[in-house]
Amino acid sequence: MSGECMLHIRLFSTNLYIRSTLLRSVSDPNTLLHYCSMSANKRKLKRQRESPDSGGGKQPRLAEGRARESGWLLREVNELRRAAQGCEVNKKRLRYLSDTQKIKQGSDGFLYWMSRDQRVQDNWALIYAQQLALAEKLPLHICFCLVPRYLDATYRQYAFMLKGLQEVAKECKSLDIQFHLLSGEPGQNLPSFVEKWKFGAVVTDFNPLRIPLQWIETVKKHLPADVPFIQVDAHNVVPCWEASGKLEYGARTIRGKITKLLPEFLTEIPLVDTHPHSASRAAEPVDWEEVLSSLEVERSVGEVDWAQPGTSGGMNMLESFIDQRLRLFATHRNNPNYDALSHLSPWIHTGQLSAQRVVKQVKREKNASESVASFIEELVVRRELADNFCFYNPSYDNISGAYDWAKKTLQDHAKDSRQYLYTKEQLENAKTHDQLWNAAQRQLVSEGKMHGFLRMYWAKKILEWTASPEEALSIAIYLNDRLSLDGCDPNGYVGCMWSICGIHDQGWAERPIFGKIRFMNYAGCKRKFDVAQFERKYTAVKENSNKDSKKSSSKN
């Protein structure tokens, strides 16, 4: 990015921040202007009222009187994007997968093969593809290859993804970018599609997982030799291959590397604007209802009502996080009874929301520095550590991928007596003796998510209640991939591997079944939060579900 471009963005950002701060000071009772006019007694009462610990465990009051109206975030972001227009993509963010790097002459356009990053704006891969197309004065196309089934993903995840893609297609139309939905494996369809449309280059996303890597290799093998094939990491703030060239042992070994590179990569993201070069041929229209009905996936796991698919839904959730929950994150993120989390993982997983955009906007909040630091540790360091693990460890989802000490201790205790043994079906249906575990599982079933603290407890109990570590890991991954909106993701695999196999952790005091793997139990959870309150909430979920089932049966 040029120095002139950076200076322009900084000046614009400073102006925008000053303007928003002045607006806030007029009507926000939490600002210094208002605060100084309050009496000492009022200030004392205000501190007591807003203290997270003052409510006897109740949800703390959120900031009141914010000057920002609904939709402020999108308006602010659009201004920032436009101010960054013309800024180049950092070349370290991309790599050529083909032997040739020369753009094929006599082409009819450029193709961005969208896969992991399913959004138009804040997408470095699409930005780079558009910059190539602009340089050659050619049309820009986007395609997405829809496989009818993927691992243990269900209708829940597919519907969320496809409704987000429908939003992508609509935005593409408004920008004069052609959107194509191809059906089937990329390796079978993409190379011939490229030849048919005479594309001069193909740009695609980065994904460290096994099947997407196989797709890349197959496409690379069958693409015309004179068509450049370029991969751009638009999912990570620091590109995976730049953060580290090897498998990192844990957060402490990668944190410094990522932090050192953030100033280079955590830049403002330019706008994807209307493309000035129209295609002579239009993409085939997509019948989205037909696409949804043609899926070969399990449909008993339905959609959830709390998560609006698409980038617009993700931006709305980000806005609510910044306004309502961010300041609670540092102190209350490990308490499942508090609404202190971002809830952004479904949109970040599907790429409907850019992690870099999230970081940029959260960092602008100057009154929640502790929470901002904690959140960036989770969103950047821990999440990108998960990509590192999956990219450099082919056995990221099985016991073979564990550290030697962990494999040995699990093997040493594999035959230990278990007080309880449950089948996969019993676990999926929350039929255990542990009401906290059952409540967490019901949350996953009903909401497509589970509180982060309970994910650890949940997976560790599966290790304790199944016949072997291999079976425990298999069931944990199956349930997460099947039920969670952010399933089939590096974060999910690493979360299960951390809980069951000690990945990115150390050995602890040896005990039955777990060996030296970190132990968690019910009593420990009771010391952390009001377990009974959480259990009551999801017992009610079970009762409501049973009532709905009875009503449905009576109607039939």
From Swiss-Prot:
Region described as Interaction with DNA: spans on this chain: 378-386, 452-453
Induction annotation: By visible light.
An MF annotation (GO) of this entry: deoxyribodipyrimidine photo-lyase activity
Comment on bound cofactor: Binds 1 FAD per subunit.
Keyword terms: Chromophore, DNA damage, DNA repair, DNA-binding, FAD, Flavoprotein, Lyase
Cofactor(s) demanded: FAD
Example GO BP: photoreactive repair
Boundaries of every Photolyase/cryptochrome alpha/beta domain copy: 108-240
Pfam annotation, one family: DNA_photolyase
Transmembrane portions of the chain: none
Protein origin, superkingdom: Eukaryota
Catalysis: reaction(s): cyclobutadipyrimidine (in DNA) = 2 pyrimidine residues (in DNA)
Positions bound to DNA: R333
PROSITE patterns: DNA_PHOTOLYASES_2_1 (PS01083), DNA_PHOTOLYASES_2_2 (PS01084), PHR_CRY_ALPHA_BETA (PS51645)
Region (Disordered) location: 43-65
Binding-site residues for FAD, renumbered to this chain: Y478, L479, N480
E.C. code: 4.1.99.3
Function statement: Involved in repair of UV radiation-induced DNA damage. Catalyzes the light-dependent monomerization (300-600 nm) of cyclobutyl pyrimidine dimers (in cis-syn configuration), which are formed between adjacent bases on the same DNA strand upon exposure to ultraviolet radiation.
Entry similarity comment: Belongs to the DNA photolyase class-2 family.
Stated name of the protein: Deoxyribodipyrimidine photo-lyase
Source organism of this protein record: Carassius auratus (Goldfish)
Top-level taxonomy: Eukaryota, Metazoa, Chordata, Craniata, Vertebrata
